[in-house]
A protein has these predicted regions:
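N-terminal signal-anchor/first transmembrane alpha helix
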Residues: 10-38, 42
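Periplasmic/extracellular loop-to-transmembrane helix junction in inner-membrane transport proteins
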Residues: 4-14, 18, 43-128, 148, ...
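C-terminal transmembrane helix and the adjacent membrane-cytosol boundary/short C-terminal tail
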Residues: 214, 218, 222, 299-345
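Transmembrane-helix boundary motif in ABC transporter permease subunits
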Residues: 3-9, 127-159, 329-338
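Generic hydrophobic transmembrane alpha-helix motif, especially the helices
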Residues: 160-205
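Transmembrane alpha-helices
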Residues: 212, 221, 229, 235-271
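Interhelical loop and adjacent transmembrane-helix boundary motif
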Residues: 269-319
Length: 345
């Protein structure tokens, strides 16, 4: 006797499946629409015609508390243009200034040089990675290989709890506490600088790097550890010469995702870096990052203005870079881990 089992139709299961699928497609559509909107607002910067910008500012002497003449300030000449007072004139597209070394968007002759912002972002990101990555990886090695279960149950939640701290809280801590402590230790002039901002951003990135690294170390097959210990290797040798190399792809993915977290951070950079757009390789000088520039200036720009379009161009660059980092970590490094473990079986 042939018995055919038919799956009973359940409206609740069908409805839940459709809702989940709709939410997934909606999420993808929202990301695509954001991507299109940001690029649409940034694109006009490349279509603007050449404009001649003339500064009518003149240098006049001003004394402070006496008749001294060693100080001078820029004073605007109202209702007249004197050719002898013209400091600069330009006849170039606004997009041509993007590769200059000056970020001066509010001026008679605005300059939108992105190099100071790129350099500031690079300095802060490098400092944050050098601070966060070693601490996170070493902490993950300790909790996965050396810590007792009770200690592991305390350390891991405490570190992961840091991920729940709002960025403004970490930024405020850096502004009020870290900046003063570091200035007293190192004796630099600028209280808020790339070093303070980098360390603060590193604190924000530690939970991400630590959690993913610990997961990668835990995912290493136990047979690797047992074989190493069985051959006479110590637990330290096993951790650093067996487990760590096997988990390298996962650790790289953790660092890359932490890099994306640092690169897109706005509030900490806005509060702790000094926000001075200048070119300097000194880590103790104030800097301005790409994301902090958007946060500081977007609320004050005129809709559709050149400055407005440049800020959206910066947002496009941030979008592309963080998207590329996340895609690299998600697809490339994860596939490396899968292939490595499958080849060992």
């Amino acid at each position: 006797m042939l018995i055919i089992n038919k799956k009973k139709f359940r409206f609740s299961d069908w409805f839940a499946e459709k809702v989940i699928k709709a939410v997934a497609f909606l999420s993808i559509a929202v990301v695509i629409l954001i991507f299109i909107f940001v690029f649409r607002e940034a694109f006009p910067i490349f279509k603007m015609d050449k404009k001649t910008a003339v500064s009518t500012e003149t240098l006049v002497q001003e004394s402070y508390g006496g008749s001294g003449t060693e100080n001078s300030i820029i004073k605007k000449v109202d209702n007249q243009v004197d050719n002898s007072n013209i400091i600069h004139a330009t006849n170039e597209k606004p997009s041509a200034t993007l590769l200059s070394k000056t970020w001066m968007p509010v001026s008679d002759n605005p300059r939108f040089g992105l190099w100071p912002l790129f350099l500031g972002t690079f300095k802060v990101t490098l400092i944050a990675l050098l601070f966060a990555a070693p601490l996170s990886i070493l902490a993950a090695i300790y909790t996965s290989m050396f810590a007792k279960p009770r200690v592991r149950e305390i350390i891991k939640p405490v570190i992961e709890l840091l991920a729940g701290f709002p960025s403004v809280v970490i930024g405020f801590f850096a502004l009020m506490v870290m900046a003063t402590v570091f200035q007293n230790i190192f004796g630099y002039a600028s209280r808020l600088n790339a070093f303070v901002g980098g360390v603060a951003m590193g604190l924000a990135a530690i939970p991400i790097i630590y959690t993913l690294t610990e997961d990668a170390l835990t995912a290493v097959p136990k047979t690797f550890i047992e074989a190493s210990l069985g051959l006479g290797a110590s637990r330290r040798q096993t951790a650093f010469y067996v487990v760590l190399p096997a988990a390298v792809p996962g650790i790289f993915a953790a660092v890359v995702l932490g890099l994306g977290r640092i690169f897109g951070e706005t509030m900490i950079a806005l509060m702790a870096t000094g926000n001075a757009a200048m070119i300097s390789m000194n880590p103790f000088d104030s800097v301005r990052t790409l994301s902090a520039t958007i946060g500081a200036e977007m609320a004050e720009v005129v809709f559709g203005d050149t400055h407005y379009n440049v800020l959206f161009l910066i947002g496009s660059l941030l979008f592309i870079f963080t998207f590329a980092l996340n895609a690299l970590a998600e697809f490339y490094f994860k596939n490396m881990v899968i292939r490595r473990y499958q080849s060992k079986k």
